[in-house]
Amino acid sequence: GISNLHLRELHIEINMKIGLCGTMSVGKTTLVKALQELPEFKDYNFATERSKYLNDLGIPLNTDSTLKGQTVFLAERCAELMNDNIITDRTIFDVIAFTQNAKSIARQDKEIFEDYAKEFLREYDYIFYISPDGLPIEDNGVRETDEYYRDIIDFSITTLIRKYSHMVDNITTIKGSTEERIEQILNVVKS
């Protein structure tokens, strides 16, 4: 009821940096837009995927991405983290995963990039990972719709989460409908 919602609102810390991570087409942007409607997050900044905008600027995406392009994506994530209270639909984990799978980036550059980028993982208070299991790929005209590539990015993200879990205070897997995911997020951040 209303009293329950009111109690929940009181227990959410004022300033939190919350990131959603996961491969393409798992509902990250949809979820951020839904969280934006909640009174609990009325004082938050929200950042959603800008790949279409960046692609329009001439920055190559997905397997065609370059070191320069991935550096722009990393800078965007860092800019988001300059906000005290932010909810974003991409994290540093995502940026590293896409960098690892870019064809034109040399292996040693990928390693240097990862080593540098991972330092910013400490900034997140919460990261929520969304699995692609059982979810179809939607074509938004920009994202990669190749199932194999989506699985590779997911594998890279989950591997990075295991590798660097000690650097993030709270990493939680969420699943289900948008409503169920919201409930899971609220349960974690209010505890």
What is the predicted function of each stretch?
Residues 5-7:
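Short hydrophobic targeting helices and cationic amphipathic motifs
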Residues 20:
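Hydrophobic anchor at the beta1->P-loop junction of P-loop NTPases
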Residues 24:
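The conserved Walker
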Residues 28:
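Conserved lysine of the Walker
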Residues 36-78:
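Conserved substrate/cofactor phosphate-moiety recognition/catalytic segment
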Residues 70-121:
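Glycine-rich phosphate-binding loop used to anchor ATP phosphates in small-molecule kinases
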Residues 103-176:
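A glycine- and Lys/Arg-enriched "phosphate-lid" helix/loop adjacent to the NTP-binding pocket
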